[in-house]
């Protein structure tokens, strides 16, 4: 198991690194050339700055049982298809039970925006978001003897 992170705009890199170190899990942070990253623990892979280049690299690397952190529903769907455990930066665990709905909602939002409409606002990140993310991440990485493993949505 390893943790692969779509790290370009990921606000929880420190939380990932802290917990991965604690449990001895390798972390791969994937960024494009417009970002710099060095946390002293993670392997950082830098790809060309092009549409979806980080996403494509991540999906090409993911294996069954890996953990993927992304806020991109398309990447989440492909990660699930490859047998990965996938979550976003707010602790939402993507699953076969919710990914179709999320992809459809994204599609509807794109149609509304193309027609000149608005679909909502982005809220400021909170401490509660960080706590929810860490709790969800630990569900994936803690050994079974250390805590509950029920990931039903």
Swiss-Prot record:
Signal peptide: none annotated. Pfam families: DUF188. InterPro entries: UPF0178. Belongs to the UPF0178 family. HAMAP family: UPF0178. This is UPF0178 protein Ccel_2994. The lineage of its organism: Bacteria, Bacillati, Bacillota, Clostridia, Eubacteriales.
């Amino acid at each position: 198991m390893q943790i692969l992170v779509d790290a370009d705009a990921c606000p929880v890199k420190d939380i990932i690194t802290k917990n991965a170190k604690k449990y001895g899990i390798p972390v791969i942070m994937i960024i494009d050339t417009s970002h710099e990253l060095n946390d002293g623990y993670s392997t950082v892979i830098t790809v060309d700055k092009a549409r979806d280049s980080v996403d494509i690299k991540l999906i090409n690397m993911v294996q069954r049982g890996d953990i993927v952190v992304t806020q991109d529903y398309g990447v989440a769907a492909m990660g699930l298809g490859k047998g990965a455990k996938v979550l976003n930066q707010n602790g939402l665990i993507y699953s076969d039970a919710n990914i179709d709905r999320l992809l459809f909602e994204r599609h509807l939002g794109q149609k509304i925006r193309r027609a000149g409409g608005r679909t909502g606002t982005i809220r400021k990140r909170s401490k509660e978001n960080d706590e929810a993310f860490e709790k969800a991440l630990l569900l994936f990485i803690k050994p079974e003897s250390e805590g509950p493993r029920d990931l039903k949505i």
